[in-house]
UniProtKB/Swiss-Prot annotation:
One of its GO terms (molecular function) is S-adenosyl-L-methionine binding. The lineage of its organism: Bacteria, Pseudomonadati, Campylobacterota, Epsilonproteobacteria, Campylobacterales. This is GTP 3',8-cyclase. Monomer and homodimer. Its cofactor is [4Fe-4S] cluster. Residues 5-233 form the Radical SAM core domain. [4Fe-4S] cluster 1 binds at residues 21, 25, 28. Pathway: Cofactor biosynthesis; molybdopterin biosynthesis. [4Fe-4S] cluster 2 binds at residues 249, 252, 266. CDD domains: Radical_SAM, Twitch_MoaA. Belongs to the radical SAM superfamily. MoaA family. It catalyses: GTP + AH2 + S-adenosyl-L-methionine = (8S)-3',8-cyclo-7,8-dihydroguanosine 5'-triphosphate + 5'-deoxyadenosine + L-methionine + A + H(+).
Length: 321
């Protein structure tokens, strides 16, 4: 079992398999060239697999595959299948912008993927183009429908931004509710890579907009996880991830492995442990030692609301959010 210095059990790893992305979202990497990253720097997936086997043996129960855009990584379905074969009890989930999902959903399901989280920031083509710099809405919606068709579990993630998509909160809720998919609204998280004009809506503002149409019956905060779950009177549940008002550090159960082999104990701390050499060499003892050290290095809090702290400079496309 992996336990940090504050007695939190760490049983969840987010694994970035690439920094590459086919979107250039305003809140993530808007000014980054499309060919900014040399693929040769990527860790071989078979080596990452060996690291994750160690993590599973140490008690990890959930692995999320992220990017960048993870569906750009060749051989991903085979990688997932090998992970699933190693331990079928481990939940394997994937975060994606959905652009390539339609053609890959069936293979991902067959490989053993438990769930896919799809980013959907608007239901309007022109807005999706403005937000992501990609004419992507049709592909993303088709990817969602195909995932449902093949039996993949789904969640939707929406970053809510003032004067951009805040007026679509109810429309997106209806879209998700009609398909029996949970949607999670995410407060914009400031970072030095985002466009300066991007401003987010806070949790209470999101709730006020939903309350104009629906009565919100109850609130549930899972013991682990970043989102608060709200239930409408018709039984539908949606989530809000609100790092500004609820840092969820007390129940944090995760670490992150970046695509270059660095283990990040916390999304908002620059400190990381470089495990690249150990992973490349498949050095079992060293990988285990560095994994345990990264857990010990987890800070108590992320300092998000500390007035003296600086805006995070580590890119979300590097750690996968």
């Amino acid at each position: 079992m992996l336990v940090d210095s504050f007695n939190r059990v760490i049983d969840y790893i987010r694994v970035s398999v690439t920094k590459q992305c086919n979107f250039r979202c305003q809140y993530c990497m808007p000014a980054t060239p499309l060919n900014f990253f040399d693929n040769e720097e990527l860790l071989p997936l078979d080596n990452v697999l060996e690291f994750l086997k160690i993590a599973i043996d140490e008690g990890v129960k959930k692995i999320r595959i992220t990017g960048g855009e993870p569906l750009l990584r060749k051989g991903l379905d085979e990688f997932i299948a090998k992970l699933h074969a190693y331990n079928k009890e481990v939940a394997l989930v994937l975060s994606t912008n959905g652009f390539l999902l339609k053609k890959m959903a069936k293979d991902l399901k067959k490989a053993g993927l438990s769930r896919v989280n799809v980013s959907l920031d608007s239901l309007k083509s022109d807005r999706v183009l403005k937000i992501s710099q990609k004419d992507a809405l049709k592909n993303t919606l088709e990817g969602i429908e195909e995932s449902l068709k093949v039996g993949l579990k789904l969640k939707l993630n929406t970053v809510v931004m003032k004067s951009v998509n805040g007026d679509e909160i109810l429309d997106l809720l209806e879209y998700a509710k009609n398909r029996r998919i949970q949607i999670r609204y995410i407060e914009f998280m400031e970072n030095t890579h985002a466009k300066s004009f991007v401003k987010g809506l806070k949790e209470e503002e999101i709730l006020d907009l939903i309350a104009q149409k629906y009565k919100i019956m109850e609130t549930e905060k899972p013991k682990q996880g970043s989102s608060k779950i709200y239930t409408l009177e018709n039984g539908y549940q949606f989530g809000i991830i609100a790092p500004h008002s609820d840092d969820f550090c007390q129940s944090c159960n995760r670490i992150r492995l970046a695509s270059d082999g660095k283990i990040c104990p916390c999304l908002y701390y620059q400190d990381a442990i470089d495990a690249k050499e150990a992973i490349i060499n498949k050095d079992t003892k060293m990988m285990k030692r560095l994994l345990k050290q990264s857990v010990i290095n987890k800070p108590e809090k992320n300092m998000w609301n500390d007035k003296n702290s600086e805006t995070p400079t580590r890119a979300f496309y590097y750690t996968g959010g």
